Curated annotation (Swiss-Prot):
Gene responsible for this protein: OBSL1
Short name of any one Pfam family annotated for the protein: I-set
Protein name: Obscurin-like protein 1
Tissue expr: Widely expressed, with predominant levels found in the heart.
Disulfide bridges in this chain: C33-C84, C149-C209, C267-C319, C362-C412, C738-C788, C829-C879, C920-C970, C1011-C1061, C1103-C1153, C1195-C1245, C1381-C1522, C1650-C1700
Taxon lineage: Eukaryota, Metazoa, Chordata, Craniata, Vertebrata
């Protein structure tokens, strides 16, 4: 048997290859790889072609699929290439890695960190190694640069330099650089220095030194940056020859970009030497920053990229290129389109310290506009790091825990991608961070730069957490560089630069370069030389691949589809494949391909195939097998290859063609298996007589044998296998069972090592294999270790017997006890057993009985009594019983004082008409008190109520008045509680408006500001911008009850500002903005016009606007239009026009003219000429078609897009159901796929649906369909008739009504005599009655378009003959019987009979005909079906006898032993192999038929037979049997006496206090007398206890239950006990009186109070839905049934809704209102005079400490900053202004609530000076504009501009701008005559600039 190649698994595959290792001599080197395969491959390591063996220094660790080579104490001789070779039956694979061993570095302190010592000559073989790498440098232009490197290796490598991937001679001429080889005395290895003479700006870049030898290639790189010196020396005129550089575009072009988008400018410059590039903006040099990137792309172009363009970025950008041969310019004008929807306040740049925070803030036009935050292109989501806040229109981003990577550009974006941009600068040790990500092509150089704050610091470079080699790193001063030359995929990852706790990270991404795979080998040939080998030869691919490659050889067994890898070959040539390389014998084909790092070539298949046979070797031979009697014996061996073999047993060959075999009938059974290389022989259930058998195995080249030895199996324990631990309670039955492997084998029981003795309390039984030890009623002393021991083996049982656990019946919940001193307190606990011990604990310490503590035990009740309590007796008590605890909390109140609450003086502040409640709590409920006010006893009245409730006394003032203020006392004996009540008028509140109001009005519009107060007589004051207003004609103040108004009859722009309506305790704010009149469209008046024009033609849209200078925008179909030759925009005075000189139909649409406030719409409709039908001079003639033919109607219109309407006979035509409508340009087509009569008529094509539109008509005529003969289908039909019978010929036509003629032998027939012609619709019939021989002939049915011929013959019927007779059959009962007989002719009529009766088809009878055969099948024959079967055909007949044999009635499922209890019903059941007749089986007992008994019944259900015994008795037990004629089965019925059982047990009952509980159970027997008990105490009938018994049912009813009645209720009868738990719950607590709304003044105490229905209950207080917990400011108190919540020192945060809850009851919510405390100014501000640059301090003292103040200067709010410091010291508020400026002078205001204080700040200005000068010379192009800009020492200073001494005035030519301290002069449309000297004078200071103009 040959295994197919699909069964060989998978060849080895390397998931991870070993990587080259470079170590220092004496260190440890380790190579690792991961290889998979099926079966798992064998891995060996080789070096120099020799397999390596493990030694002291060399080991091969392996962990699953991971294999390694570990080399300790590496020596130079260990260097070289190590090969990992993996091989299995499916193929082979290998991988190699080089190990380089270097000498340890010399301890030379002068060596640089990047230098490495040269390896010794004996160890230098291998790839080159850089000993010293080049260092990155930052130099000034003109300096000399030297880059050196030194590499080692044998043979000595060749060194060469590259710049930015290009050879040096391709970049420079030879005069600019020099290469200096190193000298031997400089050190070992090859050295090459690159010297650059007079470095230029283009010399900046990455320089890579390559080292290459025969063993490999290495490279090291460095960065060179050349900077412009601060002052460049003047150029030498001799070095300025004619320019040879030409720009790509000479004239500047225009570039538009939307705000927030990127703008990219690219300039491509050629020249030699390489030109220097400078970028300028508006005449000023540009330096790279966060938003301006300057770089050179891969194509050599110079790129300037402006990120996130803003309006300030617009202007002229110039790319200037120069070299020693000349210079050139290229310019572009950048325009930034601003969005219509803009941020009202954009973001501002911010700075922050590392680990600090940064806040970015902007404003959107509308608070409902959604925004999103970005860091460059990364969306920021709200988190702890990025906190995002939205307050109205303000959007704020707070960046927490700043780090270096947070430095960058941040954006806030709203809908429409409208953005505002800001820079976030993070100050820290790292000044210039890494970019977020860096994309580099594979093979290019990657450079990363970092600038640090301090020079000379050492940073750390790492990638994915691993430090990078030192040779890649360089640093100089503040700069740190990482240069990775020729990056590969392995270099990708997260690169981090760390400096202390600061770090910056970038994601380095390497984009792979696509490479072409190598070509395939050529000239592949196969030679079948030696026996069992094949020689394969080939040639290398052409052209040869540039990268290293190998050849992969694969094989395929003929007939299989799978190719399996054989070898991997490094060099071309030949390879010999021996037979040992294949897994099994067969014909094999081979193919080969080339594999490199860039892919795999196509396969080349060797022509032909070779027959290979593997040689088998014995890997693991047979071994003697020794087993126990009855076990399976397994013999196995492993071969080296897959091959068939033969097994022998005692010299007799065993056959392997069946899954299981036997040596001979009844002898040993065996099974032969082969899985891959393993062969197995399994002998099943060997017997003792098989001992000594000899097993042998034989195959080509291998023979082996082994012996079989059988031992008698020892006894062992089947269960339990491990030690068993069992736990029981006392009186419980204990059964320990041990099962042995042998039947009736003796065993001995031991307890705690002592042999046990049987008694009434300990019974030992043996039942077959099982041994049992029984303890009928376990006791505690029965606990111990039990052992069942037999012949050296034992089973152990750990038995623990313990008393049942103790349970606490009452109380089940925590009990709270409140008492006063000297009272007696009793704590009671009930357990479920009277003898159960308990322990009492107080505050964790066990209680001991004494005179002050009494412990009592009474039955199940346990009590702790405190006879005379003291305050120290309070605490937490516990009653511990077993594992359960009952908890009691005792609180003792000291009554040394009558008044419990309040303990001190109470101050109550209220407003008029408020409800005031004064509460005093006493220690005794019966004590009487006396209330006084200001020393006089009060008298109860409707205005003053006195209340008494338990221990609480209250004085209530329902509606307090001002005269109710005073001191109230609650007196009892010598004690009193004092309450000071202060009543004030309620503060004035502004009812409307509650929020700030913003009003926008236009000039001359009437503005009304209204404020509604809570009181009509409350005075108010109006303020505008902080100053109180005065009534005048332009400002009117009105008052109407509580409504106050401020009216501006004709508002002016200067009337805008902030208005305040101040009512003392409250204020309303109004922001008024008065704008210029809106820009409106005054003509035409309609806002939407429909205008009709002819096309082509002139279209002019005109409108008038006001004011005349209003700007408008034109839109078409929603898109803004731009002026062009085809669309002209005009503006003349107030008129605005849009003109289309040559309008086309596509110019139709919606045109909108829009001002800032209004818009008008013009719906332009361009009418086209009417549509006409073309190329039809005459009316189309009618079209006649046959049915089923296609019809195509077409016409051509004068315009392609014109719609048409098709109609048929006046009705519109719908596409579908065989109709298709097409439009092909101007052509319109209607297609009828298959014409029918319904398609005939008049078709009309009309252009459009309008009445009277042009139309074209077509007439279609469809001919009637011909009448065809449908049946019969054959053209000629033969019909046979018998003499005397009727002849009937029938024809069916395709349609009714067709004329048909009948002919016989050419003569026409008519309906007469015996011939009748009939027609019924499409059915035509010819009937000839009493056919005769003369009626035979040819009959023709002739229809108009079709005909049919009938060939009629009249013949006598043929004689029926029996070709074969029936044969007798004998079948078994239930089988089928089939009778078969052949008759002639085949269509003769036959009749079947059984026992003389005609047989008809049915479920059990089938009749069939197959040609001349007649078949009768009788299904499921029964004994009664036996008899004679007859077939009658005409006058002949044949008969056969059917015999049915009875089938043996055997039992498939036999009787089983049954155990039953007296009185139960028992069913005995058997299943027979077939359904027997009634009485086929009989039931017996003890071998005798069953007696007649009403309790016995028998039933049969198909195969199932049952015997029912109802209500078994002890006499029924015995042996029962079921018998048939062929089989018998017996079973034993055992009956045990009836036991008392619980049919329905007791159930737990839970009720409320005072209710009744009913317990009920049902027993298995009647008349049982039992006892009821609760908590172990027997119950007797009484008023609260009712006991009932009714047959099987027993019931207990308990009434009037209390909490103490909870416990265990049980019923006991004989040995039966059933119990359930009674749980009595307290009545739910309710809230009798809930809290009320409160209003307090800020800083006062607020008290909420509620009252419960019970004193012992826990209340939960909540604020705004959140639970409250006690704190120093929040107290929760319980006073009897009252619960108090006190809030001390209330603040605004305490305001809100409060509620209380107890259980499911809730009260509230109620509201707490905290009034703001009035603040007054105690110490006013003082005016300050200072000089510019000095500081000023303002102080103000207010009456309250916790007051927030606001500072303003000149009406502007002040916030802390660099020049503003604000602090608070108690009541004192301080403002410190530093570095004062002249514009800081103004009014200083401090405001704290309604209180404010004013002072003046006077600043003496210093003389105006120049701070920043314009350049001495400025060059501009003709036609552009020039901008000169200066900065003076302060804002607001006046400057004067002069040209050649003459003062310049603003105009079209000169524009003068001022922004803060910056002043600009803009010269428009510069001309040559504008060249000259310009001067700017500021005070006594001045500056000059020479303006140069270039160009024609």
């Amino acid at each position: 048997m040959k295994a197919s190649s699909g069964d060989q698994g998978s060849p080895p595959c390397f998931l991870r290859f070993p990587r080259p290792v470079r170590v220092v001599s004496g260190a440890e080197a380790e190579l690792k790889c991961v290889v998979l395969g099926e079966p798992p491959p064998v891995v060996v390591w080789e070096k120099g072609g020799q397999q390596l063996a493990a030694s002291e220094r060399l080991s091969f660790p392996a962990d699953g699929a991971e294999h390694g080579l570990l080399l300790t104490a590496a020596l130079p001789t260990d260097a070289g290439v190590y090969v990992c070779r993996a091989r299995n039956a499916a193929g082979e694979a290998y991988a190699a890695a080089a190990v380089t061993v270097l000498e340890p570095p010399a301890s030379d302190p002068e060596l640089q960190p990047a230098e490495r010592p040269l390896p010794s000559p004996g160890s230098g073989e291998g790839a080159p190694v850089f000993l010293t790498g080049p260092r990155s440098q930052w130099v000034l232009r003109g300096a000399e640069v030297v880059l050196t490197c030194r590499a080692g290796g044998l043979p000595e490598p060749t060194l060469y330099w590259e710049k930015d991937g290009m050879a040096l001679d391709e970049v420079w001429d030879s005069s600019h650089f020099a290469l200096q080889p190193g000298r031997a005395e400089d050190g070992p290895g090859a050295s090459l220095a690159l010297r650059i003479l007079a470095a230029r700006l283009p010399d900046s870049g990455v320089y890579v030194c390559h080292a290459r030898n025969a063993h490999g290639h290495a490279q090291a790189g460095a960065l060179l940056q050349v900077h412009q010196p601060p002052e460049s020396p003047p150029a030498d005129p001799d070095e300025a020859p004619a320019p040879v550089v030409e720009p790509l575009k000479c004239a500047p072009k225009t570039f538009w970009v939307n705000e927030g988008k990127h703008a990219k400018f690219r300039c491509y410059v050629m020249g030699k030497p390489e030109p220097e590039i400078e970028w300028h903006w508006e005449g000023r040099p540009l330096l790279p920053d966060r938003r301006r990137l300057m770089y050179r792309d891969r194509d050599g172009g110079f790129v300037l990229k402006v990120l996130y363009c803003q309006a300030k970025d617009r202007g002229l950008y110039v790319c200037a290129a120069r070299n020693s041969a000349g210079q050139t310019l290229s310019a572009v004008q950048l325009h930034v389109k601003e969005p219509r929807l803009r941020f009202t306040r954009p973001l501002q740049d911010v700075e922050g310290r590392e680990h600090g925070i940064a806040v970015l803030e902007c404003k959107v036009p509308n608070s409902r506009i959604p925004t999103a935050w970005f860091r460059e292109d990364q969306r920021l989501l709200p988190c702890r790091k990025y906190e995002q806040i939205e307050e109205g229109t303000v959007r704020r981003l707070i960046i927490h825990r700043l780090k270096a990577d947070d430095d960058g550009i941040y954006l806030c974006e709203m809908r429409g991608r409208v953005r505002t941009v800001a820079n976030v600068t993070v100050k820290g040790p790292i000044l210039k961070r890494l970019p977020r990500k860096l994309d580099v092509l594979e093979g290019e150089n990657a450079v990363l730069l970092v600038e640090t704050l301090e020079a000379g610091v050492e940073g750390r470079w790492s990638r994915d957490g691993e430090e990078l080699p030192v040779i890649c790193q360089s640093s100089s001063g503040h700069m740190h560089a990482l240069v990775l030359p020729g990056v590969t995929r392995e270099d990708a990852g997260e690169v981090t630069f760390s400096l202390g706790n600061s770090r910056t990270t970038t994601l380095l991404r390497v984009k792979c370069v696509k490479h072409s795979p190598p070509g395939p080998p050529i000239l592949a040939e196969m030679f079948k030389g030696h026996k069992n080998t094949v020689l394969l030869t080939w040639k290398p691919p052409e052209p040869a691949p540039e990268t290293p490659f190998i050849y992969r050889l694969e094989r395929q067994e003929v007939g299989s589809e799978d190719w399996i890898q054989c070898f991997s070959i490094e060099k071309a040539g030949a390879v010999e494949v021996p037979g040992d390389c294949v897994p099994s014998e067969g014909d094999y084909r081979f193919r080969i391909c080339t594999v490199s790092g860039h892919g795999r070539s196509p396969h080349v298949v060797f022509h032909g195939s070779a027959h290979l046979v593997p040689t088998a070797r014995l890997v693991a031979g047979l071994e003697d097998v020794q087993v126990y009697d009855g076990e399976d014996a397994v013999f196995s061996l492993d071969l080296s290859t897959i091959i068939q073999g033969t097994w022998f047993l005692n010299g007799e060959e065993l056959k392997s063609n069946e899954p299981e075999g036997q040596v001979e009938p009844g002898a040993l059974r065996y099974r032969i298996e082969q899985k891959g290389l393993q062969h197995r022989l399994i002998l099943h259930a060997v017997k003792h007589q098989d001992s000594g058998a000899l097993v042998g195995f034989s195959c080509p080249g291998v023979q082996d044998s082994a012996a079989l030895t059988i031992q008698e199996s020892p006894v062992h324990i089947l269960s339990p296998q491990d030690r068993v631990s069992l736990t029981f309670t006392t009186s419980e039955r204990v059964v320990l069972t041990c099962e042995l492997s042998r039947v009736d084998f003796p065993a001995t029981w031991y307890k705690d090592g002592q042999k046990v003795e049987e008694s009434e309390l300990l019974v030992v039984k043996m039942d077959g294999r099982k041994h049992r030890l029984i303890l009928p009623e376990a006791k505690v002393q029965d606990s111990g270790e039990f052992e069942c021991r037999t012949e050296g083996v034992s089973a152990f049982f750990g038995v623990t017997v313990q008393d049942p656990p103790v349970h606490i019946v009452d109380p089940r919940e925590h009990v709270f006890v409140h008492a006063i001193t000297s009272e007696c307190v009793m704590l009671a606990c009930e357990v479920d057993r009277e003898d159960a011990p308990v322990r009492w604990y107080k505050d964790g310490q066990e209680v001991e009985e004494s005179d002050f503590v009494v412990l009592e035990n009474e039955g199940p009740h346990r009590r702790l009594v405190l006879p005379a309590t003291q305050p120290s007796d309070g605490g937490e008590f516990q009653c511990v019983a077993g594992d359960e605890c009952a908890y009691f909390t005792v609180t003792i109140t000291d009554v040394s004082s009558w008044i419990v609450y309040p303990s001190g003086k109470v101050y109550v502040a209220a407003v008029r008409l408020e409800r005031v409640v004064l509460t005093c709590e006493l220690c005794r409920p019966w004590a009487e008190v006396r209330w006084t006010k200001d020393g006089e006893e009060v008298v109860e009245s409707p205005a003053l109520l006195l209340q008494k409730e338990d221990t609480v006394r209250r004085l209530v003032l329902p509606a307090v008045q001002l005269e109710d203020s005073g001191e109230y006392l609650c007196e009892i004996d010598d004690e009193s509680a004092s309450f000071t009540v202060t009543v004030t008028e309620p503060p004035v509140r502004i009812i409307y408006p509650r929020d700030e109001v913003t009003l926008i009005a236009v000039t001359l519009e009437c503005v009304v500001l209204m404020c509604e107060l809570s009181r009509e007589d409350a005075p108010v004051r109006w303020y505008k911008d902080g100053l109180e207003v005065e009534e005048s004609e332009a400002l009117v103040l009105e008052r109407d009850g509580p409504r106050c108004r401020l009216v501006l009859p004709a508002a002016q722009p200067e009337d805008g500002g902030e208005f305040v309506c101040d009512a003392g305790d409250d204020s309303a704010f109004f922001t008024v903005t008065v704008t210029a009149p809106p820009e409106r469209i005054v003509h035409p008046a309609a806002r939407s016009l429909d205008l009709h024009f002819g096309a082509p033609g002139r279209v002019e849209l005109r409108c008038e606007v006001a004011p005349a200078g209003s700007q408008v925008r034109w839109y078409k179909d929603g898109l803004e239009v731009e002026a062009s030759d085809a669309l002209q925009l005009g503006a003349e005075g107030p008129t605005r026009t849009l003109t289309l000189p040559h309008a086309q139909p596509e110019d139709a649409g919606e045109y909108v003219c829009e001002t800032r406030h209004e818009a008008i719409t013009f719906n332009v409709i361009l009418a086209e000429p009417p549509v006409q039908f073309l190329a039809l001079e005459t009316t189309p003639s009618p079209l006649c078609v046959a049915p089923g033919e296609p019809v195509v109607l077409s016409c051509e219109l004068s315009r392609a897009g014109a719609p048409v309407v098709w109609s048929h006979n006046g009705r519109p035509v719908q596409e579908g159901e065989g109709l298709e409508l097409h439009a092909e340009g101007p052509r319109r087509v209607l297609c009828i796929q298959a014409a029918g009569p319904a398609h005939a008529g008049l078709y009309t094509c009309q252009s459009g649906a309008a009445p009277g539109a042009p139309s074209l008509s077509f007439t279609v005529q469809v001919a009637e369909p011909p009448v065809r003969v449908v049946a019969p289908e054959a053209a000629q039909t033969r019909v046979r008739s018998t003499p005397g019978g009727d002849l009937e010929l029938v024809v069916h036509l395709s349609g009714p009504g067709g004329p048909v003629r009948w002919y016989k032998d050419g003569e026409r027939l008519a309906s007469q005599g015996r011939v009748q012609l009939e027609q019924a619709g499409a059915r035509q019939v010819l009937r000839v009655q009493g056919a005769r021989s003369g009626d035979a002939g040819e009959y023709l049915c002739d229809a108009p378009q079709d005909s049919r011929i009938f060939l009629v013959s009249v013949e006598e019927p043929l004689l029926v003959k029996l070709v074969s007779e029936l044969t007798p059959l004998t079948v078994h009962e239930g089988d089928d019987a089939t009778f078969r007989c052949e008759v002639s002719p085949p269509d003769a009529d036959v009749t079947w009979l059984r026992n003389g009766a005609v047989v008809t088809p049915g479920p059990q009878v089938e009749m069939a005909q197959n040609g001349s055969s007649r078949i009768l099948t009788l299904r499921g024959c029964q004994l009664g079906d036996a008899g004679t079967v007859t077939l009658r055909a005409g006058s002949t007949a044949t008969s056969a006898r059917l015999h049915v044999r009875e089938t043996e009635l055997l039992f498939l499922r036999r009787l089983q032993d049954v155990r039953a209890e007296e009185g139960q019903d028992v069913c005995l059941e058997v299943e027979t192999g077939r359904v027997g007749a009634a009485g086929a089986v009989r039931w017996v007992r003890g071998g005798q038929p069953l007696p007649h008994d009403s309790r016995l019944s028998m039933a049969q259900d198909g195969h199932i037979h049952r015997l029912f015994i109802h209500g078994v008795i002890l006499a029924d037990q015995g042996t029962y049997g079921c018998e048939s004629h062929h089989d018998r089965t017996l079973a034993r019925l055992s009956v045990r006496p009836r036991q008392l059982r619980v049919l329905r047990p007791l159930e737990d009952v839970t009720i409320s206090e005072g209710g009744s509980a009913t317990f009920q159970l049902e027993l298995s027997q009647e008349g049982v007398t039992g006892e009821w008990a609760r908590g172990g105490v027997q119950l007797y009938p009484g008023p609260k206890c009712h006991i009932h018994s009714d047959g099987h049912r027993h019931r207990l009813v308990l009434n009037g239950l209390g909490l103490a009645d909870s416990g265990c209720v049980s019923f006991t009868a004989d040995s039966l006990r059933c119990a359930a738990r009674l749980i009595v719950r307290e009545v739910p607590v309710t809230i009798v009186r809930g809290p009320h709304d409160l209003e307090v003044t800020e800083g006062d105490t607020a008290t909420f109070e509620c009252e419960l229905s019970q004193a012992l209950a826990d209340v939960t207080w909540e604020k705004d839905g959140n639970a409250l917990t006690p704190s120093p400011r929040l107290r929760l108190q319980a006073l009897g049934t009252r619960r108090l919540l006190q809030l001390r020192r209330c603040g605004p945060s305490d305001a809100g809704t409060y509620s209380c809850a107890v259980g499911t009851a809730r009260a509230g919510p109620v509201r707490l209102t905290v009034r703001e405390r009035t603040v007054a100014v105690l110490s006013e501000l003082r005016s300050v005079s200072a000089r510019e640059g000095d500081g000023a301090t303002f102080e103000c003292t207010v009456s309250e400490v916790e007051t927030t103040g606001r500072w303003e200067l000149g009406g502007r709010p002040l916030r802390p900053g660099a020049r503003v410091r604000i602090r608070q010291e108690g009541k004192k508020h301080i403002l410190v202004l530093s570095e004062l400026r002249a514009e800081d002078a103004g009014e200083v205001r401090f405001q704290a609530g309604p209180a404010q204080s004013l002072a003046l700040l006077e600043v003496e200005a210093l003389p105006l000076q120049m701070c920043r000068h314009p350049p001495r010379e400025k060059t501009v192009l003709v036609g552009r504009r020039a901008v000169l800009e200066v900065t003076v020492s302060r804002s607001g200073g006046h400057v004067c501009w002069l040209r050649e001494g003459a003062e310049l005035c603003p105009g079209d030519k000169y524009e003068m701008r001022s922004h803060g301290p910056t002043h600009s002069l803009v010269i428009h449309d510069v001309r040559p005559e504008d060249q000259g000297t310009y001067c700017c004078q500021a005070g006594q200071d001045s500056t000059h600039t020479r303006l140069l103009v270039e160009g024609n």
